[in-house]
Amino acid sequence: GDTKHVLLLPEDPAEAFEFAAVAFDLAERLQTTIFLMLDLDIGMNHRLCRPLRWDDARQYDRGKIMTAEMLDEGRDFGRYLDVDGDGIPYRTYPGTHPTKGSFFTRGTSRDRYARYTEEGSVYADNVQRLVRKFETAQDMVPRPLQANAAKPTKYGVIYFGSTSPAMDEAIELLEARGHHLNRLRIRAFPFHSSVASFAADHDFVYVVEQNSDGQLRSLIINENGIDPVRLVSIVHYDGTPITARFIAGAIGDHQDHLKVTPLRKAVS
């Protein structure tokens, strides 16, 4: 399916405001649609957050633009030509040059110069360019934020979005029960390499999310090739915002189960 899209995952209205500006820059730089993922809790409920602030000195990032001067210098322009190896080609504004830099394109097969083709190898070449661009996006999107437990631990938790405030409180409840977890808040997809590293550094990682299918867990497994057994799904989907009590209860019960010492088999 068509799943390779860039997603931004804010935790509250303040971060959503900031990510909205980031989304416009990313759309220009990556030349693709950027989805700013708001859930109903953030979009409709009252929430405490940092004041919304805007920097009037901020400049738009228009990405790779080929100018009339560059065209006059003889630069090789192809609308889908990857000259830098990052999957992102140069583009031109309409009317940039009277005779150069214009092109016609279509939504099906085309070559690096936007010319129609039905040749399979050319189609595959463009698909591979899109793969490179998606990999490039990993280092452009907002990176995950990690917070380590007060004590060394081999357990972690991954979460995103409006789960954040409940998770902060849940960590305190879990620590009171003697359970310590490092945590990683994912803020964008495609995932930065630190997501795979975080999973690899822990014996078990709880993936807490507010849907019935464990979609984030599936993405982490599919994108990083992680053993599913090591990612424990904690899902909440009754239509109300997730609570710290629910998170602490689900994780705490699983942690208690891990600490149970099995009885040795009786020797006759």
Specify the residue positions occupied by each region the protein language model found.
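Flexible, low-complexity linker and terminal segments
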Residues: F19, F24-S268
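Short beta-alpha connecting loops at secondary-structure transitions
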Residues: G1-E11, V229-Y237
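Active-site glycine- and acidic-residue-rich loops that bind
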Residues: A14-F17
